[in-house]
Amino acid sequence: MATIEEIAHQIIEQQMGEIVTEQQTGQKIQIVTALDHNTQGKQFILTNHDGSTPSKVILARQDSTPGKVFLTTPDAAGVNQLFFTTPDLSAQHLQLLTDNSPDQGPNKVFDLCVVCGDKASGRHYGAVTCEGCKGFFKRSIRKNLVYSCRGSKDCIINKHHRNRCQYCRLQRCIAFGMKQDSVQCERKPIEVSREKSSNCAASTEKIYIRKDLRSPLTATPTFVTDSESTRSTGLLDSGMFMNIHPSGVKTESAVLMTSDKAESCQGDLSTLANVVTSLANLGKTKDLSQNSNEMSMIESLSNDDTSLCEFQEMQTNGDVSRAFDTLAKALNPGESTACQSSVAGMEGSVHLITGDSSINYTEKEGPLLSDSHVAFRLTMPSPMPEYLNVHYIGESASRLLFLSMHWALSIPSFQALGQENSISLVKAYWNELFTLGLAQCWQVMNVATILATFVNCLHNSLQQDKMSTERRKLLMEHIFKLQEFCNSMVKLCIDGYEYAYLKAIVLFSPDHPSLENMEQIEKFQEKAYVEFQDYITKTYPDDTYRLSRLLLRLPALRLMNATITEELFFKGLIGNIRIDSVIPHILKMEPADYNSQIIGHSI
């Protein structure tokens, strides 16, 4: 039988060898694969790239570890290690390591970094990497850095050139198994919770969705675990990397942004997140002037009838009010004049309704809704990040919530109910109004992608045994109900007037047990229904059953669990603060300061 050297010469003469570049030194070599039926494994014969006599003859066997083979024949320099960075063991990324240090011994085999091929220091974040790639991955995930590739997104990442393209380096880290949950666990200790699951939108986590449609990566999700939520109703692990392409999102040339620059580009986004997050930490940090005022107030307690509990309540209410005043001012000013004019115009024509049901209501002349109530414009935070994170989703949802509150406040009849009744109505039906807003802003918010993210999060959490089957079933049912409702509304091609009347009918629902003046609220609902019927008859005279089809969609709103909606869309932004607790402060804002209608996409 011919020797290995003879087989090598025969193959080289037939020009069947492959010339590759060794990434460590940049030297071109020729690798030839010879088959010997009497020997198990693959045999690699490395020759000079000019086809001369082979400089090295190496017999290699494939190891059980994917993408790695070990040498069985050392050369004069010591033990070599042949390592392929592609799972199919192709020779496109060939790396050789020779160690001839006297203290290592001839049988010492070193692991290489799966990302760049440098000498690995151990397993970091789920993959064998060097210290350099470990630190790079940790910084990228913790700071949520966004990178761009100036090439074709297949840059060579090796020991010498790994810093040239941070985008490809990060993609390579993720592709070879580095997980973000390991990074998150280092940020704070894992808390022991009564349930094994955690929240789907924790404030320290990030939901990543690939935005670049040209990326060669396949849509394989990698789940990222979060620390257990302190709320007992925590639902899902949220931080995850999703290769889901948002439909309808324009692919833009990405810009390399550091964390500081990214925050400056998303000014109102970070401001909103910081202000709302501060509500979860009320009383923890105070400025010096505020401390002095508090001390004087505390001293006065000894000479006053005010109790300490009452003082703490006043202190908390003041913090919440100031935080939400700042939150409202962080949003760009828009069309607040419409709301002011509507409220001013109702004076003299509508009597304020208090909690006393004996007070008669004088019905306002004219329609319940005017043309100014039809416009419902939602502008998403700009710019849209390359990787959609939970704070971006949270602020988008909070803008929709603010916009819905602004819409309700602009209705004179709603204002006529008085502050307490108005707050009770919004507390009771904010989830229904928010869900209708999701359907109306389906394309602007790219709701389909957000829901797909939640579904993949559930699948991965179940596979990793992070929640029970019953809990997963509950969440999946809610998400599918939400998706089904929005899809059905989109198919009906509902216009702005129809959405306005549907929301008015939902808002003035008198069947909640905590409401007062139910008869007055019912009159508003009846008036909204009559106006809705007149509009449908005039606008769609040939569609006899359109009104019935639209009204029959409203019962599905009652099936939406407000707690789960809150967990999915708002928990990552406001922590343990409940939507019910912030609604009064939103509705008590001054009209000049309150405005979440930012000029932008018109629905």
Curated annotation (Swiss-Prot):
Write out the ranges of the annotated region (Required for interaction with KAT2B): 1-178
Renumbered to this chain, region (Required for interaction with NRIP1) spans: 584-603
**Cross-link type Glycyl lysine isopeptide (Lys-Gly) (interchain with G-Cter in SUMO2), residue numbers:** K250, K588
Which PROSITE patterns does the record cross-reference, listed alphabetically? NR_LBD, NUCLEAR_REC_DBD_1, NUCLEAR_REC_DBD_2
Q: Which GO terms describe its biological process?
A: cell differentiation; negative regulation of transcription by RNA polymerase II; positive regulation of retinoic acid receptor signaling pathway; regulation of transcription by RNA polymerase II
Location within or outside the cell: Nucleus; Nucleus, PML body
Listed GO MF terms? DNA binding; DNA-binding transcription factor activity, RNA polymerase II-specific; DNA-binding transcription repressor activity, RNA polymerase II-specific; histone deacetylase binding; nuclear receptor activity; nuclear steroid receptor activity; protein homodimerization activity; RNA polymerase II cis-regulatory region sequence-specific DNA binding
Mark the NR C4-type zinc finger spans by residue number: 113-133, 149-173
* Pfam families, sorted: Hormone_recep, zf-C4
In the record, which positions carry Phosphothreonine?
Answer: T220, T222
- Give the NR LBD domain ranges: 348-590
Q: Does the keyword Metal-binding apply?
A: yes
Assign the protein's first listed, main location to one coarse class: nucleus
**Which InterPro entries does the UniProt entry name for this protein?**
NHR-like_dom_sf, NR2C1/2-like_DBD, NR2C1/2-like_LBD, Nucl_hrmn_rcpt_lig-bd, Nuclear_hormone_rcpt_NR2, Nuclear_hrmn_rcpt, Znf_hrmn_rcpt, Znf_NHR/GATA
Record's keyword terms, sorted? Activator, DNA-binding, Isopeptide bond, Metal-binding, Nucleus, Phosphoprotein, Receptor, Repressor, Transcription, Transcription regulation, Ubl conjugation, Zinc, Zinc-finger
Record PTM: Sumoylation requires both PIAS1 and UBE2I. Sumoylation appears to dissociate NR2C1 from the PML nuclear bodies. Enhances the interaction with NRIP1 but inhibits interaction with KAT2B. In proliferating cells, stimulation by all-trans retinoic acid, activation of MAPK1-mediated phosphorylation and recruitment to PML bodies with subsequent sumoylation, suppresses OCT4 expression. Phosphorylated on several serine and threonine residues. Phosphorylation on Thr-222, stimulated by all-trans retinoic acid (atRA) mediates PML location and sumoylation in proliferating cells which then modulates its association with effector molecules, KAT2B and NRIP1. Phosphorylation on Ser-581 by PKC is important for protein stability and function as activator of RARB.
Fetch the SUPFAM superfamilies from UniProt: Glucocorticoid receptor-like (DNA-binding domain) (SSF57716), Nuclear receptor ligand-binding domain (SSF48508)
The entry's cellular-component GO terms read: chromatin; nucleoplasm; PML body
Which residues are reported to carry the modification Phosphoserine? Answer: S197, S215, S581
What is the protein's known function? Orphan nuclear receptor. Binds the IR7 element in the promoter of its own gene in an autoregulatory negative feedback mechanism. Primarily repressor of a broad range of genes. Binds to hormone response elements (HREs) consisting of two 5'-AGGTCA-3' half site direct repeat consensus sequences. Together with NR2C2, forms the core of the DRED (direct repeat erythroid-definitive) complex that represses embryonic and fetal globin transcription. Also activator of OCT4 gene expression. May be involved in stem cell proliferation and differentiation.
Q: Which family is it part of?
A: Belongs to the nuclear hormone receptor family. NR2 subfamily.
PANTHER family referenced in this protein's UniProt entry, alphabetically: NUCLEAR HORMONE RECEPTOR
Q: How does it assemble?
A: Homodimer. Heterodimer; binds DNA as a heterodimer with NR2C2 required for chromatin remodeling and for binding to promoter regions such as globin DR1 repeats. Interacts with NRIP1 (via its LXXLL motifs); the interaction provides corepressor activity. Interacts with HDAC3 (via the DNA-binding domain). Interacts with HDAC4 (via the DNA-binding domain). Interacts with PIAS1; the interaction is required for sumoylation of NR2C1. Interacts with UBE2I; the interaction is required for sumoylation of NR2C1. Interacts with KAT2B; the interaction acts as a corepressor of gene expression.
Name listed for the protein in its UniProt record? Nuclear receptor subfamily 2 group C member 1
